[in-house]
UniProtKB/Swiss-Prot annotation:
Any one GO biological process: pantothenate biosynthetic process
GO MF annotation terms: ATP binding; pantoate-beta-alanine ligase activity
Binding site for (R)-pantoate: Q65, Q158
SUPFAM superfamilies membership: Nucleotidylyl transferase (SSF52374)
High-level lineage: Bacteria, Pseudomonadati, Pseudomonadota, Alphaproteobacteria, Hyphomicrobiales
Binding positions (beta-alanine): Q65
Record-given protein name: Pantothenate synthetase
GO cellular component terms given for this protein: cytosol
Catalytic residues (UniProt): H41
Gene transcribed to yield this protein: panC
Comment field (misc): The reaction proceeds by a bi uni uni bi ping pong mechanism.
Pathway stated in the Swiss-Prot or TrEMBL entry: Cofactor biosynthesis; (R)-pantothenate biosynthesis; (R)-pantothenate from (R)-pantoate and beta-alanine: step 1/1
Pfam families: Pantoate_ligase
Subcellular location: Cytoplasm
Length: 283
């Protein structure tokens, strides 16, 4: 039987709720989200429940990670549906601040990540993005004081940046990645998939198919540049405008060459119509 989770909208209310949990010696997992929850988010919640006694889900559409030309105003907001889904999963607490609670008057501090994880992927096309993400995630960690935080691998560069930040700043939070959840045709689940027209939705799984083919060729020892060239052609011929298709070191996201050892990850970002999609796959 589902029960409606408790909801905190102010920092003082959040601290009262968390103090109550901590008084019972409970471990806490945080699942940061921007709402518009889908099965990918629910998989994060379920992993959180396996890793901690209590689960906090934050729902906050963070304005500082959107550029003026991006979709902050139109980003899907489905509060009632989100609460119902989290109730069905028996989430303990929802942290749902507004922008003034997160960024009160006089707020001026910003975390700007650097390093090989910021080397020409999302940061090249969305230079504002990771400063906004790092700042809001650092705040969420400070506010919620979780033992563990669960992030999806679909946003793989974000996962690596947050992992590095938590380590570098001694935040005391174990960051755990959770595998990408896909539609039956391979499209990575995303809140922005609702923007796709019917025709675009039929084409969208091309991204995942191209990644699988590229990964297969690399595992078989195929030439990396030839495989990337063919993947690029597959994606653009399907009607996408390609931002990047890259093979990177899976942990540092530094560029790699054909003969380098170590784990590798293929990452892609492309636009179809007005919708920008990202995806990635392990080699």
């Amino acid at each position: 039987m589902s029960r409606t989770p408790r909801v905190a909208r102010s920092l003082s209310a959040l601290r009262r709720e968390l103090d109550s949990l901590r008084a019972r010696k409970a471990t806490v997992a945080l699942v940061p989200t921007m709402g518009a929850l889908h099965d990918g988010h629910i998989s994060l919640v379920r992993q959180a429940k396996r890793r901690a006694d209590k689960v906090v889900v934050s729902i906050f559409v963070n304005p500082t990670q959107f550029a003026p030309t991006e979709d902050f105003g139109s980003y899907p907001r489905t509060w009632k549906e989100d609460v119902a889904k989290l109730a069905a999963e028996r989430v303990d607490l929802i942290w749902h601040p507004d922008a003034k609670a997160m960024y009160p008057d006089g707020f001026t501090t910003r975390i700007v990540p650097e390093g090989p994880a910021l080397a020409g992927l999302e940061d090249r096309f969305r230079p504002h993005f990771f400063g906004g993400v790092a700042t809001v995630v650092a705040k969420l960690f400070a506010q919620c004081r979780p033992d563990v935080a669960i992030f999806g691998e679909k946003d793989y560069q974000q996962l690596r940046v947050v992992t590095q930040m938590a380590r570098d700043l001694d935040l005391g939070v174990r960051v755990v990645g959770s595998r990408t959840v896909r539609e039956r045709d391979g499209l990575a689940m995303s809140s922005r998939n609702v923007y796709l027209s019917a025709d675009e939705r039929r084409v969208a799984p091309t991204l995942h198919r191209a990644l699988k083919e590229l990964a297969s060729r690399l595992r078989a020892g195929g030439d990396m540049q030839d495989a990337l060239r063919d993947g690029n052609a597959t994606i653009t011929q399907a009607g996408f405008d390609l931002d990047y298709l890259e093979v990177r070191h899976a942990e540092t996201l530094a560029p790699v060459t054909q003969d380098e050892s170590g784990p590798k990850r293929i990452l892609v970002a492309a636009r179809i119509g007005t919708t920008r999609l990202i995806d990635n796959i392990a080699v």
